[in-house]
């Protein structure tokens, strides 16, 4: 029996101490910005009806063509630099506008959550509305409809404007 123990101990001594091996290497990762691919209609048509109502688009659909990330609308900027149309602040009373005034309050966003595209505290030819990331979100490969609301005064004269405002929509990937 002692002979077997001695044989086992001598075999272990010949092998030496067993130690795990370790080494290190650097892993390099390079990321490139993911291209955002969003489809937005190129024009919006409004009709200010004779009875004081407005016909606004019901099919202004924004499509997130990405298959990997949700996107959020974070800002809308509007400008009427070359036209007579102007944006009104929240405090303006459109019932007091002069007849044929091209001053409007312009709201847009998700149904029931429309935001005023505001020029600030006074009437202006430019304005913007902002959303927090997640307020107007579109899932990957899905679409979402944008709704509009316009407050305005009365018109005596029929008017047609081929272009009233330029609009820029800014999107971001959800965090």
Q: PLM ranges: what are they?
A:
Residues 24-25, 34-36, 113-132:
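N-terminal secretion-targeting helices of virulence/extracellular proteins
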Residues 43, 75-81, 145-153:
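Generic short beta-strand segments
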């Amino acid at each position: 029996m002692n002979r077997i123990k001695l044989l086992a101990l001598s075999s272990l001594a010949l092998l030496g101490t067993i130690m795990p091996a370790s080494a290190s290497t650097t892993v390099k990762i390079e990321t490139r910005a993911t291209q955002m691919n969003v489809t937005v209609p190129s024009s919006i048509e409004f009709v200010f009806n004779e009875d004081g109502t407005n016909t606004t688009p019901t099919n202004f659909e924004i499509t997130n063509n990405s298959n990997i990330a949700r996107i959020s609308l974070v800002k809308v900027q509007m400008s009427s630099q070359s036209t007579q149309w102007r944006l009104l602040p929240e405090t303006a009373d459109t019932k007091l506008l002069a007849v044929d005034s091209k001053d409007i309050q312009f709201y847009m966003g998700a149904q029931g959550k429309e935001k005023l595209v505001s020029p600030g505290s006074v009437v202006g030819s430019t304005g913007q509305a902002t959303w927090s990331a997640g307020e107007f979100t579109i899932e990957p490969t899905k679409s979402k409809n944008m709704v509009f609301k316009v407050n305005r005064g009365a018109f005596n004269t029929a008017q047609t404007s081929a272009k009233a405002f330029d609009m820029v929509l800014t999107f971001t990937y959800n965090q």
